[in-house]
Amino acid sequence: MRAARMAQSTGRQLLRLRGVSSWPGELLGQPRPGPARRPYASGVAQAAVDQSDSQPSEASTREKRANSVSKSFAVGTFKGQLTTDQVFPYPSVLNEDQTQFLKELVGPVTRFFEEVNDAAKNDMLERVEETTMQGLKELGAFGLQVPNELGGVGLCNTQYARLVEIVGMYDLGVGIVLGAHQSIGFKGILLFGTKAQKEKYLPKLASGETIAAFCLTEPSSGSDAASIRSSAVPSPCGKYYTLNGSKIWISNGGLADIFTVFAKTPVTDTATGAVKEKITAFVVERSFGGVTHGPPEKKMGIKASNTAEVYFDGVRVPAENVLGEVGGGFKVAMHILNNGRFGMAAALAGTMKGIIAKAVDHAANRTQFGEKIHNFGLIQEKLARMAMLQYVTESMAYMVSANMDQGSTDFQIEAAISKIFGSEAAWKVTDECIQIMGGMGFMKEPGVERVLRDLRIFRIFEGTNDILRLFVALQGCMDKGKELSGLGNALKNPFGNAGLLLGEAGKQLRRRAGLGSGLSLSGIVHQELSRSGELAVQALEQFATVVEAKLIKHKKDIINEQFLLQRLADSAIDLYAMVVVLSRASRSLSEGHPTAQHEKMLCDSWCIEAAARIRENMTALQSDPQQQELFRNFKSISKALVERGGVVTSNPLGF
């Protein structure tokens, strides 16, 4: 019972990531209680399904739907739609001046990490050397996206991604110091800060004179951010809040002077007068007093970064230091995290690039059995798969950054996918590099073991991959639920909504009959990639068929079906990976890039295997009795382990 409540709570928290309700549509059989409420009754989500009781016209229905249609490709996959606006053609967002400026930065930053920064020494010292920190400040590395007028470099997201890729290639420990500072540490001030807050804090943060940290996680609050216990009580005069609490595992916690802190505050409902505790974000200065930190944590990796517990004891925070709205802290936190995930993918694309170079160097020079080992099929497959994973991650990172630079607001699922994929791909690539290098890879000197240690945290950082998988699946299912709800409402007035009903019904009937939905990437992908484009469309149709069937079966209880949601997320990730490489390789082929044929091979190889994985996953999910037995077994085995306190079976020898 407790597990079920936890699962339901997790599901609802995940669906709050974009500020929407967690209730599926009326067609799914569970209307939300209350006279004026409808499924997904908040913001844009409500607009998607809100219908007048006076049977709306087809025109008004179309208008409402058009105003709320997501441009996200990932959202579209759950609905069986090819939403190509943000993925084709592969975006080129930098103008000539931006490109030239970026080129002028790439050289010095690369040389700095090759000639000045010593990643191995940083790891050994468990801190970044002061000369390195000073050099980074002189490069402007602490304020890459802060506007020029506030002392920063003023980079857009795509320019930022290119420089972060260099950092990730050379030293992930330094990358965490820089990322914890600007990707999340003061990102809230950039996104939500008032003019006064920006002018007061950003110049010194951009120069590196002051360091920032992001304080969300607590001993009792990890993935469930809404369960934080730190509190900020407003003074009777309303001029300040008194902040108490502690935060754990805070990157830059022992270095920071400025903290973005999340705490519960009492908020009065203006309509009812009821007082509820809601999360509020604050900009907190160490100089306020009452802010202390513990010793640096001893960690598996990213040892060069500072990680510490931070304590707030009766800290007086001025009311003007509220970040965003009072009670709006959850939204602030999620926007900060969503906004920064593409940078993680970009950094890890750089990490893989550096690791692949080490693996290739060893394979090209190591002789065994009278042959260079790169001539052996097993090594060739490893290198090829490493290249594919790097290509996909890099393609995702720059796709998302470009979408953001173009002003898109529908990138949350894609950003989460890029973080999941990149962190897992980098681990696989580095693990395989060690395997190719054999015993040498296990030694400290080549530095690959350090990278492997550094990488492990990235599947936990800024939203664990498990939680993000649930977010991807639940957000996609929620949007599909809105569509089903819209169809249900349209059925109340079939004549007034004939166009909508005939279009959707025809598409679904064709899909269910195995005739396809008429979707095609023909004319969108390069003709040399037409076969891979067909594989992507077929995979999307298989995926959408299963999503619809499972939503109709489970209704709102799909939030508890984590075994199912994980498998849906995996396929959504594969689908997005397919389209980003199809898009990038199509551009390279169309523009005649020197590496176009190599990219075609990477793309085709990825699409063949990804389509097979999706087909296998969806076929298994459609074999309902077997899948349900498997899921029941997982639950029972886990329960037995917990009750026993470990492994249940006895040794084969009986003692």
Curated annotation (Swiss-Prot):
Tagged with keyword Acetylation: yes
Cofactor: FAD
Reaction equation(s) it catalyzes: a very-long-chain 2,3-saturated fatty acyl-CoA + oxidized [electron-transfer flavoprotein] + H(+) = a very-long-chain (2E)-enoyl-CoA + reduced [electron-transfer flavoprotein]; dodecanoyl-CoA + oxidized [electron-transfer flavoprotein] + H(+) = (2E)-dodecenoyl-CoA + reduced [electron-transfer flavoprotein]; tetradecanoyl-CoA + oxidized [electron-transfer flavoprotein] + H(+) = (2E)-tetradecenoyl-CoA + reduced [electron-transfer flavoprotein]; oxidized [electron-transfer flavoprotein] + hexadecanoyl-CoA + H(+) = (2E)-hexadecenoyl-CoA + reduced [electron-transfer flavoprotein]
Chain segments carrying region Membrane-anchoring: 483-516
Region annotation (Disordered) ranges: 22-66
CDD domains in alphabetical order: VLCAD (cd01161)
GO cellular component terms listed in the entry, alphabetical order: mitochondrial inner membrane
Pathway membership, UniProt: Lipid metabolism; mitochondrial fatty acid beta-oxidation
Modified-residue entries (Phosphoserine), positions: 517, 522
Cell location: Mitochondrion inner membrane
PTM notes: S-nitrosylation at Cys-237 in liver improves catalytic efficiency.
Keyword Transit peptide part of the UniProt annotation: yes
Residues modified as S-nitrosocysteine: 237
Region (Catalytic): 41-482
Record EC number: 1.3.8.9
Main location: mitochondrion
Function summary: Very long-chain specific acyl-CoA dehydrogenase is one of the acyl-CoA dehydrogenases that catalyze the first step of mitochondrial fatty acid beta-oxidation, an aerobic process breaking down fatty acids into acetyl-CoA and allowing the production of energy from fats.
Record's protein name: Very long-chain specific acyl-CoA dehydrogenase, mitochondrial
Species, as recorded: Bos taurus (Bovine)
Organism phylogeny: Eukaryota, Metazoa, Chordata, Craniata, Vertebrata
GN (gene name): ACADVL
